[in-house]
Structure formats: C-alpha cells, structure tokens
A protein has these predicted regions:
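Acidic/His- and Gly-rich active-site-bordering loop/insert found
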Residues: 18-126, 133, 143-152
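Solvent-exposed loop/turn segments at secondary-structure junctions
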Residues: 42-44, 73, 84-87, 97-101, ...
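Structural recognition of the beta-strand scaffold that forms the well-ordered cores
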Residues: 32-33, 38, 67-68, 79, ...
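Sec-dependent signal peptide recognition
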Residues: 1-10
C-alpha cells in the first residue's frame, strides 16, 4: 500500500503542531471506510471474520502485527498493538464490526454499497459502528507510519457481536484475552457531534449509560365466553396498568454527567430551549419542563430518570374467548445507580391493581452496572480538547440511554469514553439516522472523525514525533 502521508517531523513540537497532509490521508481513508461498509456483517449471523480479514490484510501491508482470536471461527476479533515506552498503562481504541439487520426492500441506495451521494456516504453501519472502527484502524496505521514515540501502548481491537451477542466479542475478549486488551483508558462508540443548519453545534463524550432491566406485567382474571363480558377481564386490567405506567413521571435524579450535560445545554442553547433546561433544576418549574421534554424530546426526558416503555403485548388466543391472562413486556432502562427492586415497588404502587403483577427479569439481567467514568480526569480533558480543536464547539459529557460494550470494560476499571462522528440533528426524524433504512454519514464527518481520533489518541498516548 502506498504511503499517503506527509509530515513535518519535529520532536520538540506537540502533536497539534504536526503537519499531516490530511487531503492525501483522506483519499485513502475514504477508500478504507467504503470497503468496510461494503462488507456484509449483519448480526445475526454476524460473519465478522470478513471484516477481520480485510483489516488484517491492510495491517499486514503496513507491517502491523495483529492476531485473530475467536470463540466461533466465523465471528472473529482482531487485536493489534503499537508499542509505547510503558511509562503509562495502555490506551484501547476499538470499534465493533457487526451491524444490525436490514430490510433491503426499504433501501433506495443499496445498504452495502458505501455509495457517495450528495456529500453523504450511505450504508448499513456507516454510523454504528464502522465509523469508529475505520477511525481507530486508520489511527493505528498513522501511528505506525509516523514512528510516533508513545508513553503508552495503543491497542486496536475490532470487536464482534456488539449488537446482541457479546459472548463472541467483548465478553469473550475479557474472559479469554484480558491480558491482550487490558488498558487504563478506552475510546469507543456512543458520543458524537450535533450539527444544526449546516454547522457543528456541540459535541458529546459518553461517560456512562443506562442499564437494561426488563420486567413483565402479568394480568389475570376469569376466563369465559366473549359474548358475556366481564369487568375482571385480564386484558382490560393490563390496558389500564399500561396507561398508568406510560403516563407516570418517575422521580428525576441527575448524576455528575447528566447534571453537567443539562447545565451546559442551559448555557449554549437558544433562549427558549436554554430556559427550559435551566427550569429542570428549579423545583417550582421542573415538572412543566419535564412534561415538555416527555412529549417533544424523548431522548432528553429519558436521561432524567429510569424509564419504562411497554413494547410487547400478549393476550388471548381466540376472538370469542375471554383469556385468563394477558402480559406486557417492558423495556426498563435504569439509571446506573438505580435500586431496581425499589423501582419495581414504585411501579406496583403506580399500577395499584392486585390483578396485575410486576414480574422482574428480562433484558440485561447479567449486564454489569459500573460507576460512570469521571469527567475531571486528565484523559477526559485531553479528549475534550481534541473535540474543540477539530470542531470548535462546546463539549458535553453524555449518559447514553442505550447500551454499549463499554459497560463490561468499565466494570473492569477501564476509563471508557464514547466518541462518534458528526451528524445532522434532523437526520433521525428524516429516516437517515442510526439503524434506519437509509443510514448515512456526511463525507465531511468521515474525515473529521479520523482527525478527532488521531488527535485524541496521540494526546492521551503522549505521542512525540
């Protein structure tokens, strides 16, 4: 592979002063990014080994040693290491190689084309998570080419099975290859940069996440003939319980990450929005602000408390038979420090119906619940500075409402920070966002995300040239 990198090398200059010819690097970077997107690694079944084979071929051409490890030969992970002087513990940079499934009939641009159309790259996984995978891969290549002198090893990992099968990915890596990936700090997915009206607005660094703690509502009542309706109908009881839970405003509780997040939004947002975020902190105005967010800004609203969403309902088997039981499956996303049994008790009081039971269990039961990564460390400050250098916008810590594999790493004491590419705020509502049927990323965002990864990695690793 041709070396498409020009440097002004000076050991006395900090990383920010190094003169990388990004125009040349970007050409190569885009080709590698498109190649990753063109690999079908939908999960299930995964087939992440296809991605690993591509990355290994690129690394071999660069003289970067790597090893492939797997629990299943078709679902491999790859680990590579750029050595430092060992004065600090390693930095892990990673991305997951699998993507969620597609419905090909709903895509107007083929989902594995990596096509460049109108300033965007289209394809499944362009945001989640081949953007991070590509940026970490290219950063590893640039570290090797420049011969950077590092204070810590930089470990690159392409990880399988993040989209629901972590026993092939992070779970397997932690249990069987911890010595190969152990690190002080990690850069992975989940943050990003919000763009409004064509301009970057603010950036986020994910430092903690909510935890899946599912439950079921089980309503019971007498069975009988549908021609003789009964007041004790299980479906009627279940419906009333679902309505009460859906309209419930659980207690708001902020942690260091979410408090800082909303305080900063109260400083940088347009006047009306800013006042609403400030109102959240005012006991006299908080309820009205929360109600607005519940209706208009569900992501913000979910960050305020443990959330409950009824997503599956089952009841009855024949139209003329009153069923004796009806159930609803709930997606509960708990705050990191939530006492989930106490929360179930609150739900029971809200429902207030002896015919409806709250049954604990479901998704995320075995998932660790680590404390948030701190937002005052030197590593966080260096990452914050990298975002400011690349995008020139305020940086906010973020609590992810979904789940990532960083939870397992945080549980092992790793300082994990989630980063991500720039995206237009309106893309989600327009059907172009993460997991959508027309997932896309700005070409500019591809290039800037690599620059962000490079600046963050070289700063945290103490690179000297």
């Amino acid at each position: 592979m041709r070396t498409l990198l020009a440097l002004v090398v000076s050991a006395a200059l900090p990383v920010a002063a190094q003169n990388i010819d990004w125009a040349k690097v970007n050409d190569e970077a885009m080709r590698n990014f498109q190649s990753l997107v063109q690999i079908d690694s939908t999960n299930p079944p995964g087939n992440e080994t296809r991605v690993v084979d591509f990355v290994k071929k690129v690394f071999d051409a660069e003289g970067i040693a790597s090893m492939i490890v797997s629990k299943d030969p078709s679902r491999a992970n790859l680990i590579a290491r750029i050595k430092g002087n060992g004065s600090k513990r390693p930095l892990l940079i990673m991305g997951h190689s699998d993507t969620v499934k597609i419905d090909a009939a709903k895509w107007t641009i083929p989902p594995f084309s990596g096509a460049r159309v109108g300033g965007y790259v289209y394809g499944r996984g362009v945001i989640d998570d081949k953007s991070d995978l590509f940026a970490a891969m290219m950063t590893t290549i640039l570290l090797k080419r420049t011969g950077a002198k590092l204070d810590r090893d930089v470990i690159f990992v392409t990880e399988a099975g993040e989209e629901g099968a972590s026993e092939f990915g992070i779970g397997y890596l932690i249990s069987d290859h911890w010595n190969d990936i152990e690190a002080e700090v990690c850069l992975a997915e989940a943050g990003g940069v919000s763009r409004r009206n064509g301009k970057p607005y603010f950036a986020t660094i994910e430092t903690t996440e909510k935890v899946g703690r599912g439950a079921r509502l089980v309503a019971t009542g007498p069975s009988g003939h549908g021609s003789r309706p009964m007041r004790g109908n299980a479906i009627a009881h279940l419906s009333a319980a679902i309505e009460r839970i859906s309209l419930w405003d659980p207690p708001m509780r902020l942690n260091d990450t979410t408090r800082t997040y909303f305080e900063k939004l109260g400083q940088i947002s347009p006047p009306v929005e800013a006042q609403r975020f400030r109102d959240l902190m005012d006991p006299a105005k908080s309820a009205a602000a929360r109600e607005y967010l519940a209706i208009n800004e569900p992501t913000f609203y979910s960050m305020l408390h443990t959330s409950v969403s009824p997503n599956i309902i089952n009841g009855g088997f024949q139209s003329n038979v009153i069923p004796s039981e009806a159930t609803a499956t709930l997606d509960i996303r708990a705050l990191p420090d939530e006492d989930i049994n106490a929360f179930y008790d609150m739900m029971r009081k809200v429902i207030n119906d002896p015919a409806v039971q709250v049954v604990a269990g479901g998704q995320g039961g075995a998932r660790p619940v680590p404390p948030p990564t701190g937002i005052t460390s030197e590593n966080y400050k260096m990452l914050e500075k990298a975002f400011q250098n690349v995008y020139g916008v305020p940086v906010l810590p973020l609590m992810q409402t979904g789940a990532t594999d960083m939870a397992q790493l945080r549980a092992r004491g790793v300082q994990c920070y989630g980063v991500g590419p720039m995206a237009d705020d309106e893309d989600t509502l327009k059907g172009f966002g993460i997991h959508s049927d027309q997932e896309r990323i700005l070409e500019e965002a591809v290039y800037k995300h690599l620059q962000l990864f490079w600046q963050a990695t070289t700063a945290i690793a103490g690179a000297k040239f």
